[in-house]
Amino acid sequence: MKIFIDTANVEEIRKASELGVLSGVTTNPSLIAKEGRDLKEVVEEICSIVDGPISAEVISLEYEKMIEEGRELSKLHKNIVIKIPMCEEGLKAVSVLSKEGIKTNVTLIFSSMQALLAARAGATYVSPFLGRLDDIGNRGIEVVEQIADMFKIHEIKTEIIAASVRTPMHVLEAAMAGSHIATIPYKVIIQMSKHALTDIGIEKFMKDYEKAFGENK
C-alpha cells in the first residue's frame, strides 16, 4: 500500500518527504484555508517537493465550473489530480475530465455504491472516509473492504485512497482491507514510526556502548 500525506502544510510535506516514504499528497479547501495561502501557489510548491500524484480540489458545486476549475488546475503540473466531491454534478464533471485524460479523485465517499458510480464515471481514485464513518457508529474499514472486493471482482482499475485516517490502526486496517493507498496526516505518520520498545532498545544500546567504550571513543 502506498502512503500519501494529507496536508497543505509545506513544511510537513517536506519533512515527510525526507523520510522517503511518500508517494503523493492530498489537499482540500479546509487544509488550504488553514495555511492562509493561495491555492495555486501552495499546489505548485507541493509539486516541487513530491514527485507523485497531488490532489487539488475544486471549489464549485456546479459541474460546468468544476470542469473549468479542473482544467485550470491540471495545467499547473503533470502530477495534478483533480479532487471532486461525490455528488451528481461531480460525477458529470469526472466523466468529462476523464475523457480529456485529466486524472480525478472522487472524495467524500461513504458507501461502496458511491465508489462504484465514481469508478464507472471514470475516476482515477476514490476516497472513502474512515474516521467520519466511525464517528457515526459505522465501521469505516468495512466500506473499504467492500470497495476493494468489488473492484477486484469486476476488474475495476480505479484505485482506493483510504482517507480521514486518524490513527496508525486505521492505516493497518486499510492496508489489510486491500486499499491501494492511505492518505495520512503528518502526526500519524510520525506515530507510525514510534514504539516504546524501540525507544527502550535504543537507550539500552547506547548505555551498553558507553559502558564498554566510553562516550568519546
Curated annotation (Swiss-Prot):
SUPFAM superfamilies: Aldolase. Pathway: Carbohydrate degradation; pentose phosphate pathway; D-glyceraldehyde 3-phosphate and beta-D-fructose 6-phosphate from D-ribose 5-phosphate and D-xylulose 5-phosphate (non-oxidative stage): step 2/3. Its main location: cytoplasm. The active site is at K83 (schiff-base intermediate with substrate). One of its GO terms (biological process) is carbohydrate metabolic process. It is found in: Cytoplasm. It catalyses: D-sedoheptulose 7-phosphate + D-glyceraldehyde 3-phosphate = D-erythrose 4-phosphate + beta-D-fructose 6-phosphate. The keyword Chaperone does not apply. HAMAP family: Transaldolase_3b. Belongs to the transaldolase family. Type 3B subfamily. This is Probable transaldolase. It comes from Clostridium botulinum (strain Langeland / NCTC 10281 / Type F). The lineage of its organism: Bacteria, Bacillati, Bacillota, Clostridia, Eubacteriales. The gene is tal.
